[in-house]
Amino acid sequence: MNNLELTYKCETDTTRPFLKSLPVGFEPVEVDDYYISLKEQVRAMQDHCNEEFTKKMQTEGKNDVPEEKPIIL
């Protein structure tokens, strides 16, 4: 039987995926610890992604964004 797994990837930093696994056949106490730990780790990953996004936005200039061109029908 497979483990319960969650993978979370940051769009701005795909080199550091986050993976959390819980073995099948766990005790109820382990489930609570698992979800508390999972929540903390996902929050940490979201914070990391937000920091990466902020850095990316600060370094991008007007010339880095392609110009919008009208669609001609």
From Swiss-Prot:
Keyword Nucleus: yes
GO BP annotations, alphabetical order: tRNA threonylcarbamoyladenosine modification
Cellular component annotations (GO), alphabetically ordered: chromosome, telomeric region; EKC/KEOPS complex; nucleus
Annotated compartments: Nucleus; Chromosome, Telomere
Coiled coil: none
Disulfide bonds: none
Key words of the record: Activator, Chromosome, Nucleus, Telomere, Transcription, Transcription regulation, tRNA processing
Primary localization: nucleus
Keyword tRNA processing assigned: yes
Protein function: Component of the EKC/KEOPS complex that is required for the formation of a threonylcarbamoyl group on adenosine at position 37 (t(6)A37) in tRNAs that read codons beginning with adenine. The complex is probably involved in the transfer of the threonylcarbamoyl moiety of threonylcarbamoyl-AMP (TC-AMP) to the N6 group of A37. Gon7 likely plays a supporting role to the catalytic subunit pgp2 in the complex. The EKC/KEOPS complex also promotes both telomere uncapping and telomere elongation. The complex is required for efficient recruitment of transcriptional coactivators.
Subunit text: Component of the EKC/KEOPS complex composed of at least SPAP27G11.07c/BUD32, cgi121, gon7, pgp2 and SPAC4H3.13/PCC1; the whole complex dimerizes.
Family label: Belongs to the GON7 family.
Protein name (record): EKC/KEOPS complex subunit gon7
